[in-house]
Amino acid sequence: MELLKDIGQLTKGCGVTFIKNDKFHYYEYLMVHPNRDTYYLFIDNWSQEVVRIYVSELLNGDYYVGDFDTVFVNKKMIEFYKRMIRCHENRIKESLKRNENKQ
């Protein structure tokens, strides 16, 4: 799977995976919306519903092209959870410092 950087990477039937924080979704590319060329149409791989996604949203760094790769998705989720753990550790440190300063 590679980051979607250019709309030209999309070919009919190709897989596109959305990954953001702890959310992910897998789509199959269909075509440009017939009435609005600022939207692209996809089939949701799990529900089989047609989904329309705005072009600029596709290029924001949260979409990847290629066959669905469970290992890749799980590594991205691990990165997210590591960031969350660091954030919570920093909050704990800040709270402890404030408590020390009060005493």
Please place each PLM-identified region on the residue numbering:
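SH3/SH3-like beta-barrel fold
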Residues: Y40-D44
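Short acidic DE-rich linear segments
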Residues: E94-Q103
